[in-house]
Amino acid sequence: MTKAEAFDKATKLAMKGDLALYDEILHPDYESMNQRVRINREMSKSILSENGPLFTVGPVQKIYENEEFVCIHRFSRIANKDVFYEVQTAITYENGKVIT
């Protein structure tokens, strides 16, 4: 499984409340930015598992991948609504784990 595939699978499982793979691929010092707000590992897990049912996530398209960086793109929608959006995600790795 590629890094992009693993991230996609882990995210989709986390959105259903299964955090095992997400825990496995995240670096202990993971941190991201979302709308200029810093999100740490535990916050990210909580956001995904609690808000997952609110979204329908489309298939992922890998834009770029190497050992240290992955860039993916996907379309999603708010569940049961005609509200669609697209997201481009940049993922960096440290020691084989997602760090940002």
Predicted region positions:
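C-terminal and inter-domain tail/linker signature
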Residues: M1-T100
